[in-house]
UniProtKB/Swiss-Prot annotation:
The chain crosses the membrane at residues 36-61, 81-104, 119-141, 193-220, 255-276, 326-345, 358-379, 387-409, 436-454, 458-476, 505-527, 539-557. It is found in: Cell membrane. This is Cytochrome b. Binds 2 heme groups (b586 and b606) which are not covalently bound to the protein. One of its GO terms (biological process) is respiratory electron transport chain.
Length: 563
């Protein structure tokens, strides 16, 4: 017995006592070890990161002196700027990933039976994420945060609903004007209220996420359409017996995803913090303090994730009257309810997106409108838009998407690929949502750095420009290859010797990444730890976590992919 325990290892023995492998956790087929199936894990990793950093920031945040304590965190607390900027962008990336996760699940039919309740809770999680981010965004007491409070205040009061004023007082206390008060008790009343709501919503997010996780483990990830083309789409317990148990393979793969996600969350904002001329809505640094002379020249914007709503309130009705707050709120509520009830409104039993043409048209148009209205809201804030302008901007996408979806062939030839745990043949996606996200971030970062380098040709801007340029070229080539109809790359024909060679390359790749990460780790301790220059250490740590995540991905390939 003792010999068996030594062979199994201490960790295996502990997990055996806990009954992890007997727990009702989803067993995963080989082909699902693809980032597109794990977007929910990336959202969860972002959520966990924002909670951890938020707890540290809470130690230094003073509601009565919100803006001053924020500046203290940036300029005086060791690695405070790294914590604050990455906390902010952790929520930003969580929102982006939540949207990508939602639309990906729609196109894959993952909202259909038996996952209806999972979809409903997912939509509620997105709404709570936006709400928690709104209150957190306003805690800084900069002009943008206070303007966001005022916009929300005016929108709710303007509905004229009985009790609207009481609801506003319940949410915002004394209102945004309290941020301008010279009395710290008045300021504290506002920001204590905002902080309270921020924490409450994060708590509700955590509770609902646990329920969402339980539902996802109940039926597992939605199988590929080539495996289960119709509802109900899930693997039976008998089928799951052939797949990989949660420990250790799922744990290893998820760990790599967490590290890569955290690396991105750390690297992106700390890089952007060193780029001048960024749009104010995505700048990691706070805007000028509300009520300060510098704030007068700042264009009022809501958080970027509410820019679509910001533009919507600029719309004029056909009679030339501005859209009313009650109509705006009604549109949002009705849209949210329809989105939640989508599993019950779509009667089709097929998971193929080409057999769900009406809802594919609606959801694709929604995705385009979210982006289009957000960009429009940033470029032309507060400009009243007549019906003719609305038709000019919103009409073409509606028609073009409708024509494409209608003409898209319904039938599609697919190849059947074995999903047993012993089958190492995997069809690789040509491009994943994560690659698109990283490509967009890299390309935008390159464009901003290039613009900044032209204006301020400093050494650091030139150094940053080179890797960003190479990454942008690579990302654009990948995306263009996909758009122009490039064929997916498959590893079905891989021989045992080729897999063996790749495993050897992976082994030496792990060693190389480990050595590079050690060098970067040593470098990090030589970089400034206080003030804005601490962002260099933040970028360094982000790269280290990315390298560790990639190394674990290579380890996963070397250990678990069978020859």
């Amino acid at each position: 017995m003792l010999v068996e325990e030594k062979k199994s290892g201490i960790i295996d023995s502990i997990l055996e006592r806990l009954g992890i492998n007997e727990a009702p956790l989803f067993r995963t087929p080989d082909y699902m070890y693809n980032i597109s199936y794990w977007l929910g894990a990336m959202v969860a990793a972002s959520f966990a990161y924002t909670i951890i950093t938020g707890l540290f920031l809470l130690l230094y945040y003073q509601p009565a002196f919100a803006y001053q304590s924020t500046q203290t965190i940036i300029n005086s607390v060791p690695y405070g700027s790294v914590l604050l900027f990455s906390h902010l962008y952790g929520s930003y990336i969580m929102i982006l990933l939540a949207y990508i996760h939602m639309f990906r699940n729609f196109y894959k039919g993952a909202y259909k039976k038996p996952r209806e309740l999972q979809w409903v809770t997912g939509v509620l999680l997105l709404a709570l994420t936006l709400g928690a981010s709104f209150f957190g965004y306003s805690l800084v007491s900069d002009v943008l945060g206070v303007n966001a409070i005022d916009i929300g205040d005016q929108l709710l009061v303007g509905t004229g609903i009985p009790g609207a004023t009481a609801i506003v007082g319940w949410l915002f206390g004394p209102g945004g004007s309290a941020a301008l008060s010279s009395n710290p008790l008045v300021r504290s009343e506002l920001f204590d209220r905002l902080l309270g709501w921020h924490i409450i919503m994060v708590f509700l997010l955590g509770v609902l996420f646990l329920f969402h996780f339980m539902l996802s483990e109940r039926y597992g990830m939605t199988p590929a359409t080539r495996e289960k083309p119709k509802v109900p789409s899930y693997y039976t317990k008998e089928e799951q017996e052939k797949f990989n148990p949660w420990w250790p393979r799922n744990f290893v793969y998820m760990l790599s995803i967490v590290l890569i996600t955290w690396g991105i969350i750390l690297f992106v904002p700390n890089l952007l913090a060193n780029i001048n001329g960024l749009p104010i809505v995505i700048n990691p640094y706070p805007a000028p303090q509300a009520g300060s002379p510098q704030a007068v020249s700042v264009q009022p914007y809501p958080p970027w994730f509410f820019l679509f709503l910001f533009k919507l309130v600029d719309f004029l009705l056909p009679n030339g009257i501005p859209i009313t707050p009650i109509l705006t709120i009604a549109l949002l509520v009705v849209g949210l309810v329809i989105l939640m009830l989508l599993p019950f409104l779509d009667p089709s039993d097929s998971l193929y997106v080409t057999r769900r043409k009406f809802w594919t048209w609606i959801m694709t148009t929604l995705a385009v409108y979210l982006v289009e209205l957000s960009v429009w809201g940033y470029l032309e804030p507060g400009v009243p838009e007549p019906t003719s302008a609305q038709i000019e901007f919103l009409g073409p996408p509606l028609v073009i998407i409708g024509i494409i979806v209608y003409l898209w062939p319904t039938e599609r030839k697919t190849k059947t690929v074995s999903t047993t745990a012993t089958d190492s043949r995997v069809i690789k996606m040509n491009i994943t949502p994560m690659e698109i996200l990283l490509g967009a971030v890299g390309t935008l970062s390159f464009a901003a750095t290039l613009f900044n380098f032209i204006q301020f040709p400093t050494l650091i801007n030139g150094i940053i420009l080179v890797p960003l340029g190479l990454f942008a070229i690579y990302a654009l080539r990948r995306i263009s290859f996909y758009v122009l109809g490039g064929k997916p790359v498959a590893s079905v024909g891989n021989t045992s010797s080729r897999i063996s060679l790749r495993k050897k390359i992976a082994f030496f790749g792990i060693i190389a990444l480990f050595v590079v990460s050690l060098v970067l780790l040593g470098l990090m301790w030589t970089l400034p730890s206080v003030g804005p220059q601490a962002t260099y250490a933040g970028m360094d740590l982000g790269v280290i976590l990315l390298l560790w995540g990639v190394a674990i991905q290579l380890y996963h390939y070397e250990i678990f992919v069978k020859e």
